[in-house]
């Protein structure tokens, strides 16, 4: 069998073309992931700056002003400083659990961002079980906190880890029941379908008006999941020094610091998606999505508008969360557990039964 030179060149060019296609596919798969990571990083920096400015305004202070214009680079400067701090390990603690705990807390939160739709086109994973995947993944974070508290071999750290686990379990159930009510209303567990179900009547189509009780319960539960005041018992300075973070320093302490703000950003995004209409402009008959489906340029414009609307609603909720920190006093541990088990759980269960009844009657 004789193979001519031209045939060999054709075979080589074919394999080269196939390898280029594989490389292009890998790069195209990494682009949205890297874009999401970059956006999350910028979002966390903005939240830290906003919290410092709003807190300074409430307390009548100046706030950060030297690190960049208006102090916008202060969070970046703090993060850079933590990178070069010494990484101290407890001599009698479990170093494996001590090191793995912060990573579990951060990774579980980062994975949850994959089901957040920033616009009709921009979502990393549009799954049929999107919101329940978020609940399942977010349930892993308290395990990391408990591991950190136990591995530190410190009574304050261990008590902080136990408090974090108890608080998360107490408020995870009402949160799940509220999400289940939204899923019943939208006839879907996909985050994209939930947003589209709210787009028919603009502002009045939001689940906020159809689920006011669920919205309030979700709001309180999400604040408790983020361990924000008045629910910051796992790291109460007056009682536990810094809770499960007491023995940490350097980059590991920075991971916990970032995880708290990532969780706050994630909760705010889910409030926007589940109750505030997501990327929809929410003015009926003014914004027609079909206008932005004509060509690629219009599609990019529509995606940009959707991202802007989603972030605007998200940062509105963030402002409420930050203002709440300086408004309400911290609860006692028994008050926190009673609020979760004796108040929010029955209300969320009743809300779910009402939603189910209305859905059955409407069939």
From Swiss-Prot:
Database matches in InterPro entries: NADH_UbQ_OxRdtase_su1/FPO, NADH_UbQ_OxRdtase_su1_CS
GO MF annotation list: oxidoreductase activity, acting on NAD(P)H, quinone or similar compound as acceptor; quinone binding
Enzyme class name: translocase
Annotated transmembrane regions: 30-50, 98-118, 129-149, 248-268, 300-320, 343-363
Bilayer disposition of the protein: Multi-pass membrane protein
UniProt catalytic activity: a plastoquinone + NADH + (n+1) H(+)(in) = a plastoquinol + NAD(+) + n H(+)(out); a plastoquinone + NADPH + (n+1) H(+)(in) = a plastoquinol + NADP(+) + n H(+)(out)
Subunit structure: NDH is composed of at least 16 different subunits, 5 of which are encoded in the nucleus.
Family: Belongs to the complex I subunit 1 family.
Keyword Acetylation listed: no
HAMAP family: NDH1_NuoH
UniProt keyword terms in alphabetical order: Chloroplast, Membrane, NAD, NADP, Plastid, Plastoquinone, Quinone, Thylakoid, Translocase, Transmembrane, Transmembrane helix
Translocase in keyword set: yes
Protein localization: Plastid, Chloroplast thylakoid membrane
Signal sequence annotation: none
Entry function: NDH shuttles electrons from NAD(P)H:plastoquinone, via FMN and iron-sulfur (Fe-S) centers, to quinones in the photosynthetic chain and possibly in a chloroplast respiratory chain. The immediate electron acceptor for the enzyme in this species is believed to be plastoquinone. Couples the redox reaction to proton translocation, and thus conserves the redox energy in a proton gradient.
E.C. numbers: 7.1.1.-
Name of the molecule in the record: NAD(P)H-quinone oxidoreductase subunit 1, chloroplastic
Encoding gene, per UniProt annotation: ndhA
GO biological process: aerobic respiration; photosynthesis, light reaction
Organism, scientific name: Gossypium hirsutum
A cellular component term, taken from the record's GO annotations: chloroplast thylakoid membrane
